[in-house]
Amino acid sequence: MKGNNTIFKQTLLLILFCIGSNTVSAQQTFTNPILDYGADPYSTYHNGYYYYTHTMQNHLVLLKTKNLADLKNAEKKIIWTAPKNTDYSAEIWAPEFHFINDKWYVYFAADNGSNNTHRMYVLENNSKNPMEGEWIFKGKIAAQTDKWAIDGNVFIYKKQLYMIWAGWEGDTNGQQNIYIAKMKNPTEIDGDRVRISSPTNPWELHGALHDDVNPPQVNVNEGPQFLSHKNKVFIVFSASGCWTDYYSLGLLTFTGKDNLLDPLAWVKSDKPILEQSHKTKVYAPGHNSFFKSPNGKEDWILYHANSNPGEGCGVKRSPRMQQIRWDKKGNPVIGDPISEGFPLAIPSM
């Protein structure tokens, strides 16, 4: 019996060791995609937690986790549902949560059911915990011209609050540009907008449409995201139509001194910094955001992409993440989109 007990104990210890090893392994690595679906992924880090969201069409959802690679097990809450029959009841796109001056804000684009009416809106929450408190609708946020607008991103540069977004120059669809403006406060734009990017390069001009609702061709710059590294300032944006496999990320580099509203100070990359890869079987990567690892030492990118060619702008888009490197000149290097199922180390704790 003693021999049998010894064998039993050794076997049990081996099983427990294997289980423990697998648990540790699962905690230390992850694979893309990090969720089965989710377009326009955005995350912000605050007080030891990541707060994540993505486009949900008619409501806003917030996920809370210490590890973005474990989003499937994150705490989840619907924090706001659009009321019916308003200018902002439908097509809620690209929400972003920001903690500014001890308050939480969520910026999003929405319309009344017709894409031509898309504008940006903002909610405010006085609670230090965005999963609690009351989210109050503060209204539309627009420049003086008040044209079609989506994909708002806010940031602070040298103590000044700015907003960047995608919009139309006039009142008809056909081309989306990137605009920037100063903000008076987190709910108001100060003055008018300045255009800093338009689709001009061949890789930005994949936008043919084949339906009766839209123009035959729409050229796209959208989804701008602020990025800084040491003393350099960038805006990463999405180019070409999301309905094409050529949806990709481009880079604007600020070459001026202090005036971010100088359009001549923004220089565009000659080619995408992230694009589809037949080699890794990832298609239409775009509409990204950035985050740092919990220890603050690593820079990471979140983006959505499709697993197969021709899947377009639908529910097949899923969020992925991978680490950013920096070249000797201080420019971001992303590389190819990582293959699905390829194990990656989680962001350093």
Predicted features along the sequence, with ranges:
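Bacterial Sec-dependent N-terminal signal peptides
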Residues: 1-28
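Carbohydrate-active catalytic/glycan-binding domains of CAZyme proteins
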Residues: 26-349
